[in-house]
Amino acid sequence: MTCGSGFCGRAFSCASACGPRPGRCCISAAPYRGISCYRGLSGGFGSQSVCGAFRSGSCGRSFGYRSGGICGPSPPCITTVSVNESLLTPLNLEIDPNAQCVKHEEKEQIKCLNSKFAAFIDKVRFLEQQNKLLETKWQFYQNRKCCESNMEPLFEGYIEALRREAECVEADSGRLAAELNHAQESMEGYKKRYEEEVSLRATAENEFVALKKDVDCAYLRKSDLEANAEALTQETDFLRRMYDEETRILHSHISDTSIVVKMDNSRDLNMDCVVAEIKAQYDDIASRSRAEAESWYRTKCEEIKATVIRHGETLRRTREEINELNRMIQRLTAEIENAKCQNTKLEAAVTQSEQQGEAALADARCKLAELEGALQKAKQDMACLLKEYQEVMNSKLGLDVEITTYRRLLEGEEQRLCEGVGAVNVCVSSSRGGVVCGDLCVSGSRPVIGSACSAPCSGNLAVNTGLCAPCGSAVSCGRKC
């Protein structure tokens, strides 16, 4: 008997509160998480608490049946079951407020674990595919036949490329050296021009100082001339006033003085004419003096003005030249700084190019030395192989000669056997001695028994036939002919 799912969606078992009935098995309907229906109660209760006396036959957490227990076939007799009365009391079943949250968290954890499990499965499949791919590649590489490649053309091409690169580096080094020389020459020219402009500036400054002194002298002279002109004007005014005063006094004396003159009636003296003539002379002298003073003053003023204008124009031209020289000096200074920067950059580039060229040349030399060593070793190996090949060919030639000799001997022996000739001993002669025989050799000489044949032989040991290979003489078995 189970309760519904109204308590937070969890099912709990009440079958533990009732005892087992005959002919029935106890089936637990507890949730999969545990045996407690309410997580807040300590200890809780479940389906196994009541059926503790029938533990051997109780059902598990997965609603399974075990043979030989309560859930299996009923035995012929049922034993008495003792039940704890305290378990029959009503239970205080309450809804856990955190049960929904816990259930939601468990669902989220299950989803996360399912996602991870799916990711692991995908990863395992991917790794299996990669493993199969690698196994296929491994089998392909194992089944592929190894072919010998001649590396000498590759090394020669690489050496040629390194040589061309070294030549390009040398050409670039020469070009950069020429550019550096040109830049140095340009810098020397700019330096000379700068020194010339500095000397011209010093000369212009000296001329400016001299002209300034001349202008100061002219200004002082002008001031002196103005002071002199003013003094002369004052003196002229004073003389004019003095002349007027003297004339007035003279007229007053003449008009107030009565002079008794004894006159000679024989002559007539007109004093008015004499006075008028003297007055006219004085007036003429005064006017000429005034005109001369004014003309001299005007001339001097014009000269001073012309001198001032000329010196002002010269000063203006000198200032313009000084400003132009300053601008030229600034421009030349900037050009010199730019030339210095370019020279520094070119020197750094040349140094870097030299270092790179030296490194490339050193690397090329090392690789060339390695290639030469490898080539020399290959030549030595080839010479050894040729020597071994020559030795093998010599051995083969000797074996061919021996095989031919044996074939001829066998053919001759067959012919003798066919003709009925007795058995003869065959020996293989040595190149260093003759044959030991008692019969005639092929050469026609009869050697002494136990001595060497004088005829040249092939150098082999005697065989069981008892005949010498070149001469057909009989020798003992196992001895040298």
From Swiss-Prot:
Name of the protein described by the UniProt record: Keratin, type II cuticular Hb1
Segments for region (Coil 1A): 107-141
InterPro entries: IF_conserved (IPR018039), IF_rod_dom (IPR039008), Keratin_2_head (IPR032444), Keratin_II (IPR003054)
Region: Linker 12, residue numbers: 253-269
Ranges for region Coil 1B: 152-252
Residues covered by region (Linker 1): 142-151
Cross-link (Glycyl lysine isopeptide (Lys-Gly) (interchain with G-Cter in SUMO1)): K212
Family: Belongs to the intermediate filament family.
Domain IF rod residues, every copy: 106-417
Tissue: Expressed in dorsal skin.
Domain of life: Eukaryota
GO CC, alphabetical: keratin filament
Region (Head): 1-106
Region (Tail) location: 414-481
Presence of the UniProt keyword Chloroplast in the record: no
Residue ranges of the region described as Coil 2: 270-413
UniProt keyword terms in alphabetical order: Coiled coil, Intermediate filament, Isopeptide bond, Keratin, Ubl conjugation
Miscellaneous field: There are two types of hair/microfibrillar keratin, I (acidic) and II (neutral to basic).
Assembly: Heterotetramer of two type I and two type II keratins.
